[in-house]
């Protein structure tokens, strides 16, 4: 899944527009950030880019148009959406966003971790399948063959529909099943998420007990620097750095786990 975001500086419309591909490819990351900075936008923390237009497979994101956005939040959201493996998850995310009227970036990011809890009916012609999908949703997407064989999907669907709690949206009829929006994203520290398998995974903290920021290496230079800024780290010498995982042999992992006092973060030189 690829999207394109057309961004501008709301304080300087004369600077024109810049189109960013989402998720941002590693080999384009530094160049894109430099281009945004040249237009006096693209701060690591501030929502200083105006979303003029977004093009892609998620019409619900049109509600971000005309609003200020943060480029790293936008990139993370695009990566999360790219992880959705089927049309059902797309409908769950977009339907829940309409049902709960979410349009804030933090809410949309958190919704990617929660939308799997809602049931969305997009086709009422096969109630047996509707009931089976609803049962799977209620059980975290898992069910044994025996459970499914013994399930009366038609009756399960009728019971759901008869409750009358469905919200009609352009993406289907949404039944929230008591969904509680996850709060894993606090507006600053992105939750752990492996978009691409990294060679090395680290966490950094401003101090012991502070929220963790995840680093997936190798990564573009500016992405690492911006991640440290989001973590609140002014001087890298003062940060708490922890080894989490790697694709290196076990012997190398043992060495990496011993000490990070003099570690230089590797970067992607593409």
Set out the residue ranges of the language-model regions.
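Short, surface-exposed beta-strand/loop "edge" segments at domain boundaries and coil↔beta transitions
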Residues: 12-16, 57-60, 181-183, 207-214, ...
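Mature extracellular/secreted ectodomains of secretory-pathway proteins
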Residues: 84-137, 269
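Conserved small/polar residues in nucleotide/adenosyl-binding loops
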Residues: 261-270
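N-terminal ordered "arm"
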Residues: 1-44, 197-233
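Acidic, aromatic-enriched beta-alpha/helix-loop junctions
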Residues: 30-60, 64-66, 226-252
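Acidic, proline/glycine-rich low-complexity IDRs
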Residues: 132-211
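Acidic, low-complexity intrinsically disordered segments
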Residues: 62-69, 73-86
């Amino acid at each position: 899944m690829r999207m394109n975001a057309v961004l501008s500086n709301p304080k300087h419309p004369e600077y024109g527009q810049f189109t960013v591909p989402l998720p941002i490819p590693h080999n384009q990351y530094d160049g894109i950030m430099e281009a945004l900075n040249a237009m006096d936008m693209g701060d690591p923390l501030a929502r200083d880019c105006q979303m003029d237009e977004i093009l892609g497979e998620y019409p619900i994101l049109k509600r971000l148009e005309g609003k200020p956005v943060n480029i790293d939040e936008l990139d993370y959201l695009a990566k999360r959406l790219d992880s959705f493996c089927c049309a059902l998850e797309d409908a769950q995310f977009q339907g829940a966003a309409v049902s709960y009227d979410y349009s804030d970036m933090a809410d949309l990011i958190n919704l990617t971790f929660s939308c799997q809890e809602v049931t969305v009916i997009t086709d009422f012609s096969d109630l047996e399948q509707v009931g089976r999908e609803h049962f799977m949703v209620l059980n975290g997407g898992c069910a044994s063959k025996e459970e499914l064989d013994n399930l009366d999907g038609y009756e399960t669907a009728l019971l759901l529909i008869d409750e009358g709690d469905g919200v009609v949206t352009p993406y289907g009829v949404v039944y929230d099943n008591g969904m509680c929006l996850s709060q894993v994203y606090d507006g600053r520290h992105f939750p752990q998420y492996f978009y691409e398998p990294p060679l090395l995974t680290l966490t950094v903290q401003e101090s012991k007990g502070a929220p963790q920021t995840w680093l997936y290496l190798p990564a573009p230079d500016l992405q690492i620097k911006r991640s440290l800024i989001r973590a609140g780290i002014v001087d890298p010498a003062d940060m708490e750095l922890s080894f989490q995982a790697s694709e290196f042999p076990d012997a190398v992992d043992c060495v990496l786990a011993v000490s990070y006092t003099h570690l230089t973060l590797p970067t992607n030189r593409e």
